[in-house]
Amino acid sequence: MLIPRQQAPDLSVDTLGAGRFRLIDEKPERMTLVCFYRGLHCPICASYLKELERLTPAFAERGVATIAISSDDEARARAMADAQLGRADLVGHGLSLADAGKWGLYISASRGKTSIGIDEPALFSEPGLFLIRPDNTVYYLSVQSMPFVRPNFAEMVQALDFVIKNDYPARGEQLLEQPAA
């Protein structure tokens, strides 16, 4: 289980416009925002990624680099970027399900065509959002088991202002032992 202040798992995927993305090689001023999304078949992901793209300059002003990653293959990732985004360099693809599991992402099985008529892959990862510090430690994480109710990017930009101003530490670093059943 990932918890704040611990090392993030390895993450290396191809992008549509910027070559290979390797998290360990990223050296943003403050953090890298990693947005895992379900894929081309998800209409909620499309609007979510549009909002991320819109606010990417605001994140950059705060020293936060952004990338959106799915387990889609290159063709599906390109179709999503072409239909929904103005920048292909924001999109990574080919996340293995094993790597998705290392990030604590939930995996779902296909239920056929979605509400927008696109087939779901046989298996795919559900959404997750992470802020990773330049030393590759987890600062923030949120993982969803459904496509609904994701962290709000505009609120995150505002929260980053507070975090930066107050040098606010990563929280949630303690896990309690669970009693035996």
Name what the model sees in each region.
Residues 1-181:
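Chalcogenol-based redox active-site neighborhoods
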